[in-house]
Amino acid sequence: MLAKRIIPCLDVRDGQVVKGIQFRHHEIIGDIVPLAQRYATEGADELVFYDITASSDGRVVDKSWITKVAEVIDIPFCVAGGIKTVEDAGQILSFGADKISINSPALTDPTLITRLADRYGVQCIVVGIDTWFDESTGRYQVYQFTGDEKRTKATQWQTLNWVKEAQHRGAGEIVLNMMNQDGVRNGYDLTQLKQVRDVCHVPLIASGGAGAPEHFLDAFKQANVDGALAASVFHKHIINICELKQYLSQQGVEIRTC
């Protein structure tokens, strides 16, 4: 059995790490490189960096900090933000990133997933999915351009259908960003995770809602996700990564200890 992964998420805007609630009202957390170093030292298995306004601004992720991060950490990291071409992805990988993640550009042009997978291999192609539960319809809907409040919009895709489509086109991993839960720390949406797990045959990463060690345990035990991504609980020192891993190990979760 592969070890489960604990993945701090660093949302990047204007060269700094920020954090919002339900993808809104972002506050500045700190500088990118020191935070990356901190999490690598504290026992993170992997890091994810999202340039949250790149797609809505019509630009690719700011590459200036990627090389610096690669120089100071020795764990894998993934970079996302406005990657629209095979060349964009190649540059980011050449600067030291281990994976690239695409979200809004894949919704605009789903063939991008296949072209990236064909060029670089499915193992380094992640598809991020921003999903919102609409109480009025009882459906999970995929949203696009979520880094910009003015441009955020619902797409034609229901979440389960897009998960299937992304895999069919070559996604090697799915990160499910559950927007309703983002930053509120009341737990991952286990109902949604279980539904997605049933149709997701590549590694699945839960994102949005972690507030306590038990929330990570629930995601691993009840929804059988491969990794759990979180931000505010790590940024604000609410949860210590090593202590979290010790707790999960004691509860029978296969995980790399610090």
Curated annotation (Swiss-Prot):
> Gene3D superfamilies per the record?
Aldolase class I (3.20.20.70)
- Identify which residues the record assigns to the active site: D11, D130
Q: Does the keyword Cell cycle apply?
A: no
Give the UniProt entry's GO cellular component terms.
cytoplasm
Annotated disulfide bonds: none
What Enzyme Commission number(s) does the record list for this chain? 4.3.2.10
A molecular-function term among this protein's GO annotations: imidazoleglycerol-phosphate synthase activity
Swiss-Prot/TrEMBL catalytic activity: 5-[(5-phospho-1-deoxy-D-ribulos-1-ylimino)methylamino]-1-(5-phospho-beta-D-ribosyl)imidazole-4-carboxamide + L-glutamine = D-erythro-1-(imidazol-4-yl)glycerol 3-phosphate + 5-amino-1-(5-phospho-beta-D-ribosyl)imidazole-4-carboxamide + L-glutamate + H(+)
User: What pathway, per the record?
Assistant: Amino-acid biosynthesis; L-histidine biosynthesis; L-histidine from 5-phospho-alpha-D-ribose 1-diphosphate: step 5/9
Extract the InterPro entries matched here: Aldolase_TIM, His_biosynth, HisF, IGPS_HisA/HisF, RibuloseP-bd_barrel
Q: Which UniProt keywords apply?
A: Amino-acid biosynthesis, Cytoplasm, Histidine biosynthesis, Lyase
What broad class describes the main subcellular location of this protein?
cytoplasm
Q: Which SUPFAM superfamilies match?
A: Ribulose-phoshate binding barrel
Transmembrane feature ranges? none
Q: Which Pfam families match?
A: His_biosynth
Q: Where in the cell is it found?
A: Cytoplasm
CDD domains given in the database record:
HisF
- What are the recorded Gene Ontology BP terms? L-histidine biosynthetic process
Q: Does the keyword Cytoplasm apply?
A: yes
Subunit structure, as described in the record: Heterodimer of HisH and HisF.
- What HAMAP family does its record include? HisF
- Entry's family note: Belongs to the HisA/HisF family.
Name of this chain's protein: Imidazole glycerol phosphate synthase subunit HisF
User: From which organism does this entry originate?
Assistant: Photorhabdus laumondii subsp. laumondii (strain DSM 15139 / CIP 105565 / TT01) (Photorhabdus luminescens subsp. laumondii)
